[in-house]
Structures are given as structure tokens and as C-alpha cells.
Amino acid sequence: MSRKRSKMSSSGTISNYYVDGVMAQEPEDVYAPRLIQASHTVTPRPSGAGDNADFSSCNFAPKPGVFSSSWSSVHPQGIYHPYVHHHHQPHLSATDGRYVGVRPWMEPISNHVSFAGFHPSNTRPYGAKPDVLPAKVPECDTLEPEARPVPAEFSCGGALGAEKVTKEQRRASEISSHGEPKDEKQQLDPNNPAANWIHARSTRKKRCPYTKYQTLELEKEFLYNMYLTRDRRFEVARILSLTERQVKIWFQNRRMKMKKMNREKGGKDQL
């Protein structure tokens, strides 16, 4: 067997492409007039039956055109598909080109692609290039754990598991925070209300202690004047970022503390 590379031309829209064909074992002098010269120039020949007549020994089967009358010169055999690759099936290289029946005894092509532009009756399977489209990423549900190990926090169920853990922690913290009041309520004796004051909780608001800076400024103001006018009280409250009521209460408490200290001091002097 000998491999011959020939350059063919057609009168249609597609021309000047190469065809690798496996020719039958015959003397070279039979195909000598058909070989292309070194100048690579070939006179155009009529397409269709004329081309098939030159290769009558290969049993070419002519097929009707698939397009309108203006496209009658182009046959399905002449359509070149860009996805046909020669190195996948080197012994069937003739199937990529114009002539189909070079090696009819060969095995059929495993991968086929159907073209929407052809009529179903005139369609011919073409060798498809494998792995043309990128592989689709499998979903998390269908992915096997052995195929792709992923940490638990980054897996599909990791987020749900983290949410469940946080919810459980919140519930545990709520139970622990509210556990003492429940125990206290259980310890209360409805039959003995006099003993309930031991476990009673204070309803007073928590004290809002003044900062050291605020206390120092209020002490200075108190030493300067034990009683503040309303205007001065508003001014001090504005400077110290306090309310007028807080300044008023602090001065009242400071005066009561001073009176108590004076009484204690007077009692010691009498003794």
C-alpha cells in the first residue's frame, strides 16, 4: 500500500484543500498522469460526475446536491468539517474529504456528528473531534466523596452544619443564662411569701457611675458653689455630656454627704 497526497480543486465555494487517501495496490504508472506537478498548478475540472469518473476504480458513489440549484455544484462529499482530525484515524483520511468510498471495508467511525444543514436522507456521519466541549462540573450531590476530597467547612453541607452548630450554641447559652432565674422561681415558696424576699431581685435600675473626669469636674464646681443656678446647671451638663437631671441629683447627694460628714465631725468634737 502506498499513501498519495494530491491537491484537488472544486468550482464551488471551497477549493484548494488536501486529501489524504489510501489507494489500492496498483502499478504507479496507472496513477502517473494524475499526480500533481511540482508547480502545484492544476487546471480546474468540472465537479460532480467528472471527478468520480477519474476514480472509478475506487467505487465512488455520487450523491445528489443538498442545496438549491445555485449550489448544485457543491456536494456533501465536498463539505469540509473543521472538527475532523486526521491523526485520530489515519487509515480513514479519505472520509474527511471529497470522496467517501475509498476503503468501504474499513470499520465505521465510532463518533458521529449530525449536521442540521443537511436533509436527514442525505446526511453522512463525520468523525467528531473528541473533547471539543469542556467537561461539565458535576454537582455536589452527584460528586463522589472519594473522587474529590473537600474540607467539611467548604463542602455543600458545611454551611448547613455550621448554621446548626451556631443555633445549638445559642440555645445552650440561652438556657445557661436563663437557668438561674428558673431555679430561683422554683425555690420560691408560694405558701410562705415572707421568705420570698431572700430570693427577690431588685427592680431598681443599675447605677450609672460617673467617670473620673466627670466626678472631678463636679467636685470642683461643688467646692466653688454648693448650689447651682439653672443656667449654670445646664452649662455644666453640656460640658460634661450629662443631663441636667444628673447634675442636679449629683449636687443633692453631695450636699447630703457633706451634712452627714459635718454631723459626725461635730459629734466627735463634743466627745
UniProtKB/Swiss-Prot annotation:
Record GO biological process: anterior/posterior pattern specification; DNA-templated transcription; embryonic skeletal system morphogenesis; proximal/distal pattern formation; regulation of transcription by RNA polymerase II
Chief place where the protein resides: nucleus
Record-level GO cellular component terms: nucleus
Localization annotation: Nucleus
GO MF annotation: an example: DNA-binding transcription factor activity, RNA polymerase II-specific
Pfam families: Homeodomain, Hox9_act
Protein function: Sequence-specific transcription factor which is part of a developmental regulatory system that provides cells with specific positional identities on the anterior-posterior axis.
Alphabetical keyword list: Developmental protein, DNA-binding, Homeobox, Nucleus, Transcription, Transcription regulation
InterPro entries: Abd-B_homeobox_TF (IPR050803), HD (IPR001356), HD_metazoa (IPR020479), Homeobox_CS (IPR017970), Homeodomain-like_sf (IPR009057), Hox9_activation_N (IPR006711), HXA9/HXB9/HXC9 (IPR017112)
Keyword Lyase: no
Record's compositionally biased regions (Basic and acidic residues): 164-187
Cross-referenced CDD domains: homeodomain
Region (Disordered): 161-195
Protein name: Homeobox protein Hox-D9
DNA-binding region: 203-262
Assigned protein family: Belongs to the Abd-B homeobox family.
Protein origin, superkingdom: Eukaryota
